[in-house]
């Protein structure tokens, strides 16, 4: 997979739309697994997942949707990307 970085890396110390990203690269740098929640711009929960520590996850979302970490959000690194399956 090829990725194109489209913005500066940030974290989830507070709710973020990650520069209005539709695709996000997320790295949980904390020592434990963390719960990540996706919400609409109106703050309605769409869903959540557990991000294992030390793992990278690629998430698709709507531009105005936000991501939050249940705790230790400063340890969760996020960046807006584009991707391709080309090798």
Sequence positions of predicted segments:
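Serine/proline-rich low-complexity intrinsically disordered segments, especially terminal tails, linkers
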Residues: 15-16, 33, 50, 86
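Asparagine-centered strand-capping/turn motif at beta-strand->loop junctions
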Residues: 20, 24-32, 71
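Short, surface-exposed beta-strand/strand-loop-strand elements in extracellular ectodomains
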Residues: 27-47
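Exposed low-complexity, polar/acidic, P/S/T/G-rich flexible segments that act as propeptides
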Residues: 74-87
